[in-house]
Amino acid sequence: MKKPLFLTLLCVLSLGLFAANNKKPSERELVSQNMPEIEAPTKKYKVLCFSKPYGFRHNSIEIGKTMMEVMAEKTGLFDVTFSEDLTEFAPDKIKQYDAICLNNNTHLQKGMKDEKMRETFINYVKNGGGIFAIHSATDGGWKEYVEMIGGNFDGHPWGAGGTWGIANEDPNHPVVKNVYKGENFTIKDEIYQYKDFDRTKNRVLMALDLSHEATGKKNGKRADKDYAVAWVKNYGEGRVFVSSLGHNKEIFYHPEILKMWAEGFRFVLGEVDVDTSSVPKPAAK
């Protein structure tokens, strides 16, 4: 073989190996790499992931579905059914699910207009169903829905392109104690402020850290400066977990957020019991 040809082939091979070694992982691979291990579940549950928005459609909906699929596979906690069809909320169908993931389904009230379907859904939760609400699942709803979720979207001064301070207000709580080892942190995402939010009816786990300079400079609407980011609650016999985080795609493969979400699912499915009693807002430092 002539030397120039040999060198050319060697260069091509080297470039191929370099490209292979530097290939960016897919979003699914990132979710899988960062999905935490959990305690072995006592059973396999059934979860509906409902992803139909009736307002703004987030481009993170698809990776939300990927996250659900990977969590189901890697933890063995549940089997998941994906749907954008409201017939899944019919009485004979909804009862088969142990919990429902509301995956960025903005303005659900605009789709679920039938009063009987609304009543069926709310009673499903009151009678023991679980709700795992991501980001814009808190945007809209009707009176009973907002009561069940715990708050209603009222703008987002903390935009998706910014990095904001998050206070872990309940660092010993099972759902968040392993997130950054219970410490405060910063994260890049869109953070909501809420109306119809009453801390005494929710167990706030995380909230905006207004002592963080960029976060504190934004003008929120609440006189009490209470901007919850994640909480748990009971609604009748049902269990509800809410995450304001979930606008940016990166949240769905963020290793620390996945820790919280995995434990949130264990709670809403009834795999573990956690304290949902309200705690006062910590005094500002």
Each language-model region and where it sits:
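Nucleotide donor/acceptor-binding cores
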Residues: 45
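A glycine-rich, often tryptophan-bearing local segment used as a flexible ligand/cofactor-contacting loop or short
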Residues: 106-182
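Active-site rim elements
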Residues: 55, 135, 161-163, 180, ...
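Helical hinge/lid and interdomain linker segments adjacent to catalytic or ligand-binding clefts
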Residues: 49, 56-140
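Catalytic beta-strand/loop cores that center a nucleophilic Ser/Cys/Thr
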Residues: 28-33, 158-236
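Positively charged n-region of N-terminal signal peptides that target proteins for export
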Residues: 1-4
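Extracellular ligand-binding/catalytic regions of CAZymes and related secreted enzymes
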Residues: 22-42, 62, 73-75, 212-229, ...
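Bacterial N-terminal signal peptides
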Residues: 8-16
